[in-house]
Each structure stands twice: as structure tokens, then as C-alpha cells.
Amino acid sequence: MLKKYLITFCLISLFSINSNAAGTGDAGTTKSDYDKAVTIIKSAKKYEKKGKTEKANKRYEKAQKLLIKSNKKKPLQADTLNYLGFTTRKLGDFENGEKYYLLGLEIEPKHIGINEYLGELYVVTNRIDLAKERLKVLENCNCEEY
């Protein structure tokens, strides 16, 4: 009888060790700082549409911090620079927002998001001719940004 319990205990222990060794499966699902920032930006846009500017700005600030971290880890990524320009512009710093956009365009001149958002920045800062140049780049993209 004791032998039976001992064998059962050993088998249970053996299966427990194997299942713990397999892990939880979460190791590969950690979101990057960039991905987290994009999710936060989407949330901020929803608050902005509802007129909740303060909540939107808090999210833009949070996203901006994550994007700065992302840019340090993987510098000069056009998508990251696009959203850095976007969050910076949304927080009212048009000059630095423009710098991020222009740096992104040096890397990827036909980047749809950068051209769209830079055009918006030019409209807000009353530089319509420059906004039209951004539109010209988007003219043949067959995209909603145009």
C-alpha cells in the first residue's frame, strides 16, 4: 500500500515538474513600447473626439514617453518618428513635432502617416503651400489619408 502511494506521489510530482517547465506561454506576448504607445494614442483620439481634451492630453503624454523610449532602443524608425511628431504636435509643440516628421521623411519620403500629419501641422500653422506639397505626395496613394 505504501509502495502504491509512493508511486502515485512520484508520478504526480513528475507531471507537475513538466507542466511548470513548460511555462505560461506569455513570454512572447509582451508588447513593445511602440505598440503600447499606439494603443494609448488610439484611446487618446477617442477622448479627443468626445471633447475630453485633458484626458486625451494625459494619454498623448504617456504615449510620447513610450515612443521616446522606443526611439532610443530602435532609433530612426519612420513609424516611431511619425507618432512622436503626432503626440508632440497634439501637445501643442508644433516646432518639435515638425522636426520629428521631417526626420521621418528623410528615412521614408512617401510615408503616408507622416505626410498626412505634417500637412495637418502646416494647415494649423497657416503654411498652406507646404500643406499642398504634402497632399501632392499623397495624391496617388489611393488611401483614406488623401
Regions from the language model: what does each represent?
Residues 77, 111, 145-146:
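Residue-level recognition of tetratricopeptide repeat
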Residues 65, 69-72, 102-106, 139-140:
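Conserved structural position within tetratricopeptide repeats
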Residues 106, 119-145:
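TPR/TPR-like (Sel1-like) alpha-helical repeat modules
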